[in-house]
């Protein structure tokens, strides 16, 4: 069975994805209610009862609010670093089945090799993940990997090193710089937070990262996620990344739900 990634939803309203291998089914983040996650999984042909674990990037509600309902499943492992686990648990009455990892250490969960790495964001200890599977010399299951990188204000060199060489990349393209600047509903302080070094990635910075990684030869597919509903649009993101479509498969996750059509190929 090929490894599948289903982005169940991604926006400031909630983030959650299903990573499914032949032997393992995990959620990356749980930014919706447990009931909503269950419905989204059913739409993807999966059951919440079949989920083997949850991996959390950080404690913000659009990534972790579903843990409240999932905590009723007493034996469901939830992987997080200590600061994230403590921040989430402090808001709950039920004890979560925490599996604490140290940032930067590789560990095995079933048929997945997992490594976390710090990313700059205004939470206690935000991380990204790489997930790897397959074996050298196995014609039916060769080595493959995926990087999950959302909620970061800029891309340090060490983050680039962690994600260089993956075949699939999930990266945020949160806002268009001009739309954010012109937005009259957000106060100046909020705009500064969003575009600061512990905020979110603009379309421009996300594009520069993907363009650089596209020259490495290993990257095959990119998922653009966490689009702002107010300060970004599918059309702007599509136009920005269109010139890379001849090199990569690019999937834009609609913040209203679903997947936007692929960019039309243009010359960079």
Please annotate each region the language model reported.
Residues 6-16, 57-67, 85, 116:
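Structured catalytic core of nucleotide-sugar glycosyltransferases
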Residues 34-80:
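Active-site metal-binding motif and surrounding structural segment of the metallo-beta-lactamase
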Residues 1-44, 127-150, 168:
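Conserved beta-strand hairpin/beta-sheet module of binuclear metal-dependent hydrolase folds
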Residues 65-74, 89-90, 232-240:
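Metal-dependent catalytic neighborhoods of phosphoester/phosphodiester hydrolases
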Residues 28-31, 51-59, 79-82, 147-150, ...:
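Active-site neighborhood of phospho(di)ester-bond hydrolases with catalytic His/Asp-centered motifs
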Residues 157-254:
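Cap/insert and terminal regions of metallo-dependent hydrolase folds
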